[in-house]
Regions:
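Conserved loop->alpha-helix
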Residues: 1-173, 180-181, 190-253
C-alpha cells in the first residue's frame, strides 16, 4: 500500500525488452532513500506498483509485464517519474490509501495557472465516472488529490479532435480500462438513467494543485491531450461492489 504522497522524482534511464513483450526499467531514484529498500520490495512508479528486482548504483530496476504496459501510461519510455516506497504501518497517511493498481487512464483537458495554484481538469471514461465524487480522493500518476468538481460531458463537447488518437480512444471506450468491480464486461462505475440512450459521454473532474504539489511531482509536465494513470479510492471500490450485490444475497441474521 501507498499514500499517494510522492517521495521523489526519479527518472527511467533505460527500457530493455524482456520476453513476451515485457520490459525491464532501469530507474534512477533521484532523492529517494534507497538504504532500506531490498530486492522484492514494492515501489510505485507513476502510481503503478512495481517490484524491485535489482538495486543499482543510481537506483533500481523493475520488470514490467505486457499487461501492465497496456493498462498504464508513462512506463514505456525514458523520462521523469513519480516515486513512492510502500508505506509502513507506522507511517502517517498524508494522502489516502493507494494500492498502486491502476484502474484506467484519463486524459488531461486543462492545466493552467489560477492565482498561485494550478487548475487541473481530467476526462475519465464512463467506466470510472461513478467513482468520482465532489471532495472525494483520486490518484493521478501516483499523486493523492482531492476532486473539487465533477461533470458529465458529451464526448463531442469534451474532446479536442487535435488530441492524439490514443487519448480519444480511451474516452470512447476503445482504450485500456479496468472495471474495478463486477462481472467481466460490466462497468460498475458507469452512470445509468439519463445517459443510457444518449450520445457517448465522459466524466470531467477538476483538481486544484497547490504550488508544492506542482513543484514536487511530474504533474508540472502535463499538457492537454496527455494520458495519465488513474486509481479510484479503495472505499469507493468496496461501496460499488456492495451496491452491486445488494439484494442478491440472502438476509443475514
Amino acid at each position: 500500500m501507498f499514500t499517494g504522497i510522492v517521495a521523489a522524482i526519479g527518472s527511467i534511464r533505460q527500457v530493455s525488452p524482456l520476453g513476451e513483450d515485457g520490459v525491464r526499467l532501469d530507474v534512477a531514484a533521484g532523492e529517494l532513500d534507497m538504504s532500506d529498500v531490498a530486492i522484492g520490495d514494492s515501489i510505485a512508479i507513476q502510481g503503478a506498483c512495481m517490484t524491485v528486482v535489482e538495486k543499482t548504483a543510481e537506483g533500481f530496476a523493475v520488470d514490467v509485464s505486457a499487461e501492465s504496459l497496456r493498462r498504464t501510461t508513462g512506463l514505456a519510455g525514458t523520462g521523469p517519474v513519480n516515486l513512492e516506497k510502500a508505506m509502513r504501518l507506522s507511517d502517517r497517511v498524508g494522502g489516502h490509501l493507494v494500492s498502486g493498481h491502476v484502474d484506467g487512464l484519463g486524459v488531461v483537458r486543462r492545466f493552467e495557472p489560477v492565482g498561485e495554484s494550478h487548475l487541473l481538469e481530467i476526462l475519465a471514461p464512463q467506466a470510472l465516472a461513478g467513482f468520482l465524487v465532489y471532495k472525494g480522493s483520486i490518484t493521478v500518476d501516483g499523486v493523492s488529490l482531492t476532486v473539487n468538481h465533477v461533470e458529465d460531458l458529451p464526448l463531442a463537447k469534451a474532446v479536442d479532435p487535435a488530441w492524439p488518437e490514443a487519448a480519444r480512444a480511451v474516452l470512447a471506450g476503445r482504450g485500456p480500462s479496468v472495471a474495478p468491480a463486477g462481472a467481466p464486461g460490466t462497468a460498475i462505475g458507469a452512470h445509468s438513467g439519463a445517459h443510457a440512450e444518449t450520445e457517448p459521454w465522459c466524466c470531467a473532474f477538476q483538481i486544484n494543485l497547490i504550488p508544492h504539489t506542482v513543484a514536487q511531482t511530474t504533474l508540472k509536465r502535463l499538457t492537454p491531450g496527455r494520458l495519465v494513470n488513474l486509481e479510484i479510492d479503495t472505499v469507493a471500490r468496496y461501496l460499488a461492489r456492495m451496491q452491486e450485490v445488494a439484494g442478491k444475497l440472502p438476509a443475514q441474521n
